[in-house]
Amino acid sequence: MTISDREWVARHLQLLTAEIPSDVVAVTGRLVADTIAIAGYARAHGIGGAAFDAASVQFSGQGSSVWGEEAKAAPLDAAFLNGTAAEALDFQEVLINGRNNGHAAVVIVPAVLALAGQLSSSAEAVTRALWVALAANIGLGEALGRAHRANGLGFRTTSLTAAPAAALGCATLINNSLDTALAALGICASTLPAGLLSAMSPKMGSYSPDKDLSVGFSARHALHSALLAGAGATGPEAPITGDKGWLASYGAGSADTSYLETPPSERDLTAYSIKLYPANFGCQAAIRASIELGRQFAPDEVTRLHLEVKSSSAASLSTRSIENHLAARFSLPFAAASAFVRQRSVLADFEGKAVADPAVHAFIDKIELTGSDELEAAHLSRGIFPARVTAYAGENVLARVSYDGPFDGYSAAQDEAVFAEKLASLCGAERAEVLLAYSREPLSDARLRTLV
C-alpha cells in the first residue's frame, strides 16, 4: 500500500527532534555558503536574470538579505532575487542520483534563509529545515523519475521537486504542526510555477534568462506557500500521490511511489555535489580532463579532441552556436575547447569577450562529441556524470583521460581547498572567510547572523 502524503510529511517532521548527523551538518553548511557566494557574484556583475529581476522590488534597510546587495528586501522578494541570482551562473550544486538529478539548493536555500531572517530563527532550526527540505527533494525526485523531461516534455526537475521540498522545510520554521507542513506542501505542489527547459534546448537556441527567473519564482512560491499555510490556508490531503495530483500530473509514466517509503533519516545528503567549474554539471568531468590534456599538448598538436559522455548530455549540451554566456555554459564543445586552449576553466572564461575568443572557437571545430550508452547506464545506476576525453594527432591517440566527475579521486583536504578557492573567486577573500566559517559551523547562531 502506498504511503499516505500525511505520513510521508510526518516522517520528515521527525527530523526536527532527531540527532543531526555530522554529514548533514557538513552538507547543509557547504550548500548555504556555495549558494550565497554564487548569487552574490551574479548580482554584483548583473549576470543573466540578476540584471533585471529587481524590477518592481523595493529595497530597504529592513527585511531579508539580498546577496550581493547592501540593502534588504521583503522576504518573498528576497527569496525571488536570491533564487534568480543563484541560478544565473549555472555554477550551483546538483543532486547526483540515477533516478532523477537536478538542482535544489538554488530554491531551498533562498526560501529558507529569507524566512529565517524574518523570524530570527536559530541556526539549529535552519539546519533542520534544510535537512527536511533536502531529504524531501531526494524522495520527490526519486518518486517522480525523469520522464517529465524526456520524449519532448520539458518540465524542469528543479521546479517540480525543489519547490515543494522547500515549502515543507520553510513550514518547519513557522511551527512544528503536521497540518501546517502538509498544507504548505499541498499548496506549493498544486500551484507550481512549473519551469520549462525550452531556454536550454539546443534545437531552440535561445539560452534566455527565463531559466534564472524560473528558479526565483520557485523559491518565492515555496516560501509564499509556507506562509499561507502558517496563516491557516489548506491544500489537498494527498497532493503528491492523490488523484490528479503532483505525481499523476508530472510523472509521465516514470512515477513510482515506492521511493517515498525510504525514511527521510536514511537519505544521503552527500549526494548533493557542488560544481568545480562554472558550467553545466554534464560538462564538469570533460572540462577537468580537457584541462589536463591542454597542459600536455599545444592546440596545434591535436587534430581531434574526442569527448565521450552519457548520451543524454551529448544531446542536451551539443550546441556550437555560442551567442551568450548561458549558451557557453551549456555547450560541451565550448566548455571543453575553452578548458583545453586556456588550460583552466574559470568565471572569466564564460563572460564578455571571452565567449567569442577566436582561439577557442577555432578549437571547437576539433571537438568530436559522442553520446555513450555505456556511460548513460553508469549514470543511471550510480548517479555519476562520467567523461572520457581522447586527444588525437591524425589517427594516433596522444592521450586519454577519464573521470567520473569533477572531484573524482580528490582527498578531503583537496576537496576543501578547491571549495575555498571557488568561494574566493566568487566573492573575494574576506567574504569567502565568512562563508567558510559558516560552512564549518552551521549550527552557530553567530555564524548564521552574518548571512541573514
What are these regions (language model features)?
Residues 69, 221-332:
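Accessory "access/gating" subregions that flank catalytic or transport cores
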Residues 21, 170, 211, 275-279, ...:
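Generic alpha-helical structural element
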Residues 1-270, 441-452:
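N-terminal core-entry segment
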Residues 139, 154, 212, 239, ...:
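Residue-level preference for alpha-helix termini and adjacent loops
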